[in-house]
A protein has these predicted regions:
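Structural motif detector for alpha-helix initiation sites
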Residues: 7, 134-135, 337
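Short, glycine-/small- and polar/acidic-enriched structural segments
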Residues: 31-197, 208, 213-221
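Pocket-lining segment of extracytoplasmic ligand-binding domains
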Residues: 130, 180-280
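Short linear loop/turn motifs
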Residues: 68-69, 281-290, 335-347
Length: 365
């Protein structure tokens, strides 16, 4: 009898232990975060400080997301990574997908789900003392671009045409970016540099005063980049995209509320990105001058426009399609806009208390 009782007791203990293990495994499974790899369309820099600040403040944790970032250069790399599910989303320029919708083109099963860079990052920069005062003054001048295959060239061409400057009335020189591009402008090899805002800011920080030419009105305040995902992910797991977009939106709000804290959080996670030369105050001032213009383009909303993070306007696409047609890349303008983007998840992106996020950001030390 004693032996029988002992066996019964051991049996109860074993069942209890098994139940505890099962519960623990269930809890662990419930707590496992969803992996989300975001493709950064450039090298790691303070341009992604808003994502890092979002991680630092716990916004991705709150959405149960393990967010990772990988630098990727150009659509030739980004698109295969998306299609092979190596990354879940990418910050991508809009042009390649529009071109892919043309007859005979690849017609990739991709879609933009979030308007990220709400105001184009591309600028027309001239030296501060340049005789070029308007876009119309570029007739007969040489303009510097990243490469002849750069996606923004089509819009540049359309902007010049709108100002009465035919493409064959300017010279175009591929200068890359960085030292060689800046030297081309300083030496008057080119009279206008057509890079993105943070690249131009870097040149100014290095000691070359610049002036930006004003775009024609129809090209102002239109998107240049967004979050691109596969149609399959959008169909199968829209909730994951919504959670990612909400955390990213909160990161943007937080960074804009506390630029200095946002930059310091970026350096905390990427210490190798912090410049080594200069005093702490000088380093902070110079890097903020580079970072802030990017955050302003992320947070751009036209006067009176509802502040709905991630939302596209139809104009973002119609202006681009017209520009690509002017550049010869689009022959058929009748592209269903629903094949390019969706605003379906915008309400989910904006389900948070902006004031609370701003307060948390300002309190971060």
């Amino acid at each position: 009898m004693m032996q029988s009782k002992s066996f019964r007791k051991l049996g109860v203990m074993a069942v209890g232990a098994a139940a505890m293990v099962s519960t623990a495994l269930s809890d662990a499974a419930a707590q496992a975060k969803d992996k989300f790899v975001y493709g950064v369309p450039s090298a790691i820099s303070s341009a992604i400080a808003n994502f890092v600040f979002a991680k630092e403040l716990g916004y991705f944790d709150q959405e149960n997301i393990d967010m990772q970032m990988v630098p990727l250069a150009g659509s030739a790399v980004i698109i295969p990574q998306l299609l092979s599910n190596q990354i879940q989303a990418a910050g991508a320029s809009l042009e390649p997908l529009v071109i892919a919708r043309q007859p005979g083109k690849a017609n990739f099963p991709l879609k933009f789900v979030y308007n990220y860079l709400r105001n184009s990052v591309w600028e027309f920069a001239v030296t501060a003392n340049s005789p070029v005062k308007t876009v119309a003054d570029l007739r007969g001048k040489t303009i510097g671009i990243v490469s002849l295959g750069s996606g923004n060239v089509y819009t540049t061409r359309a902007i010049l045409a709108a100002a009465g400057v035919p493409w064959d009335q300017v010279k175009v020189l591929a200068v890359g970016f960085g030292v060689q591009a800046f030297e081309a402008l300083r030496s008057d090899q080119i009279q206008m540099l057509n890079l993105w805002e943070s690249a131009h800011a870097s040149l100014e920080v290095a000691g070359t005063p610049l002036r930006r030419l004003e775009y024609p009105a129809q090209f102002q305040g239109v998107s240049s980049h967004g979050f691109e995902v596969t149609d399959a992910l959008l169909k199968d797991n829209p909730g994951l995209i919504a959670r990612f977009g909400r955390a990213a939106s909160k990161g943007s709000v937080a960074c804009i509320a506390n630029y200095e804290g946002c930059l310091k959080a970026f350096w905390k996670h990427y210490p190798e990105q912090k410049p080594k030369v200069g005093t702490e105050e000088e380093i902070l001032r110079k890097e903020l001058a580079i970072m802030v213009p990017r955050m302003q383009n992320i947070g751009y909303f036209a006067p009176g426009q509802p502040k709905r993070w991630g939302e596209y306007a139809e104009r973002d696409w119609t202006v681009l399609i017209a520009a690509l047609k002017a550049g010869g890349e689009v022959t058929d303008e009748n592209i269903p806009l629903s094949s390019l983007y969706t605003n379906a998840l915008v309400p989910e992106y904006n389900k948070f208390d902006s004031a609370a996020v701003e307060a948390q950001a300002k309190a971060w030390k």
